Amino acid sequence: MKKEIGENVHIPVGSVILEGRLDVPENTDRMIIFAHGSGSSRFSPRNKYVADVLNELGMSTLLVDLLTTRESIANAARFDIQLLTQRLASVTHWIKEQPVFRNYHIGIFGASTGAASALGAASLMPDMIRAVVSRGGRPDLALPALPLVKTPVLLITGSLDDEIT
């Protein structure tokens, strides 16, 4: 499917600028925001593959780093689910503030700790986030938020992943 927009974006969130990759096929009203896990980035081959497939199916994608380069080096920030949740919520608001995306349906694809932040953001924004997909996620890291999640959630785990299953 032909892409209408394919660009690197810089998203202001508080005192930092987050970097991401935005791909928008023609004639769509759906956006999937990717929240990757600790130790990964928007360049994750797995997430890029899933994003490419979603683009081919006519869905827009935003692969975003929820931490700056400096923050991702510090172990504490990589596992700060509250910070990651707030950043993901801010990124979601940023998308909805863009006139072209105002009426888009938003879903979150979270991997590992990114799934915990996706669930946290969904608990804060039930009317804005329409679905959450967790790939190898850690919903246990979002326990306080789980009772508040009203959004449909799909949990995908590997059968040999003892930490997850």
Predicted features, each with a name:
Residues 110-118:
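Gly/Ala-rich beta-loop-alpha elbow adjacent to hydrolase catalytic centers
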Residues 127-139:
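A conserved short beta-strand
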Residues 9-104:
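Serine-hydrolase catalytic machinery in alpha/beta-hydrolase-like enzymes
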